[in-house]
Amino acid sequence: KLANALGAEVTLFTRSPNKEADARRLGAHHIVLSTDDAQMAAAKGQFDLIIDTVPYVHDINPYMPTLNINGTLVFVGFLGDISPMVSTLPMILGRRSVAGSCIGGIAETQEMLDFCAQHGIASDIEMINIQDINHAYERMLKSDVKYRFVIDMASLKV
């Protein structure tokens, strides 16, 4: 949503074709199924910037060739040590780089909140009652979660 509102042409890399409808609703212009070799080959050299939001260790090597010369893959999720998994050849030959970024401070956060308010951008969440927290946790373990869970504090009995 944010990248689209900022005027970027947005492409979603996904392992699941089931995410296409939501991705388009959220502002993606293009979808690349990362498990499809033909789609990944067609995306070669297409991107100046990839923002990697995946919050667990995964192989980034298939994505490096999709970066243009001087392109950058930026991690915003903490993965820990990925060094044994990264091939430097595509980075050296394509002048590609890998970077990391954290959430901004108070001023940057307020700026983004103001931008979201001006553009009608809100988070997509799944509201749950506190009584359903164990079920939500089980769903999370099974990767049966579409959006972030948010606990309805009104359901908390004091």
Model-derived regions: residue spans:
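Helix-to-beta-strand junctions that scaffold the AdoMet/dcAdoMet cofactor pocket
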Residues: 67-69
